[in-house]
């Protein structure tokens, strides 16, 4: 794990700790800190799915947005983790979350995910092809809270 990933985990942990204290299952909430907007939803068991939209571009000028899954044992899995694939299934479609952005297929996949997560009433998370959680979400709340592709993309 490199220093950049470690910094993200520390930031994510701080933000997630504040989210967990007041998280109502099924309602998206937003937090912001150090150039990162984070959008999280919890399930009834306490698992949390987070979309991280960074405002800090990498050395090539690309925004390396990501997702996190915080499990009930507080283990955090990130789409940036080496050897980890995260797939979101919603509305009978799968969305493989790219491990990095700044290339056409990755940016297109991220755009589709951000567009469609706003409309999902329920979605499943798979980590390395194993189901890791099922989340229900209120679409009205999602439309108010979640980012648009322009707020969380590489346009």
Residue ranges of model-derived segments:
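A generic "folded-domain core" signal
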Residues: 22-155
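Bacterial N-terminal signal peptides that target proteins for export
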Residues: 1-10
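N-terminal signal peptide c-region/cleavage motif recognized by signal peptidases
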Residues: 18-20
């Amino acid at each position: 794990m490199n220093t950049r990933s470690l910094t993200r985990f520390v930031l994510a942990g701080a933000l997630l700790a504040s989210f967990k204290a007041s998280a109502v299952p099924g309602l998206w909430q937003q937090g912001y800190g150090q150039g990162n907007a984070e959008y999280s939803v919890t399930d009834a068991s306490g698992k949390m799915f987070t979309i991280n939209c960074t405002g800090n571009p990498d050395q090539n000028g690309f925004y390396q947005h990501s997702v996190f899954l915080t499990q009930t044992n507080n283990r955090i899995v990130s789409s940036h983790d080496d050897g980890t694939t995260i797939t979101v299934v919603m509305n009978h479609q799968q969305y493989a979350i790219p491990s990095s952005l700044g290339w056409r297929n990755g940016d297109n996949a991220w755009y589709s995910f951000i567009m469609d997560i706003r409309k999902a009433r329920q979605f499943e998370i798979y980590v390395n092809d194993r189901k890791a959680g099922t989340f229900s979400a209120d679409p009205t709340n999602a439309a108010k809270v979640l980012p648009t592709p322009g707020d969380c993309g590489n346009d």
